[in-house]
Amino acid sequence: MREVQKSLPPETLCAQQAADMAQINALAKREMTPEEVYTFSVRLCDNEIDRDGERFDAQTLRELAALFIGKSGIFDHCWSARGQTARIYRAEVCREEGRTTAAGDGYCYVKAMAYMPRTEGNQELIEEIEAGIKKEVSVGCSVREAVCSVCGAARGECEHVHGKRYDGRLCYTELRGAEDAYEWSFVAVPAQREAGVMKRFSPQTRRTLKAFLRTEGHKEALTELD
């Protein structure tokens, strides 16, 4: 997860570090130094069809990349301030040349850079990230619509079945129009094989923050919003 670019010349590394610190300090309450922070990369989500038979389109990924800047990293989607462990300071959509999705288009994903302070309390987590133990992530977000790839109807309003082909067209649900990004979490088993996306919205419910909280059972957070 952590990227080490040993091949870059020193002047490039210095410029990159300066740019990173400028973005980190835009989020921090006081100016941090490179020695005080640990940075690592995460693959948040992609445009591959996931275990739920759903996927984001490329445009929605670009929208999510912008929305996730500044969002907290937590554990298992447990919405508690005590669980905040890292924060995203940069995100972009990347493509893997030569790779296609099950839907037949070019594969792309949201790559994010996150930071956390190098404190005694974070040392164990940093070591787990470096060792590849804490690796899989899942995101909590909302989208404007979820439609059938075959007919374009809203999810649940047609008879097409995920995984089946109709006149050669694979059926899956396409998630379009990012509305909000809530958080990203370290999890054991993400919905997406490469990253992980948590999506438990009914097709009839507008995908708002309160709807997400009700679906996930976060009563305390709902009380704070109300």
Where are these regions (language model features)?
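Signature of dsDNA virion morphogenesis modules
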Residues: 1-219, 224
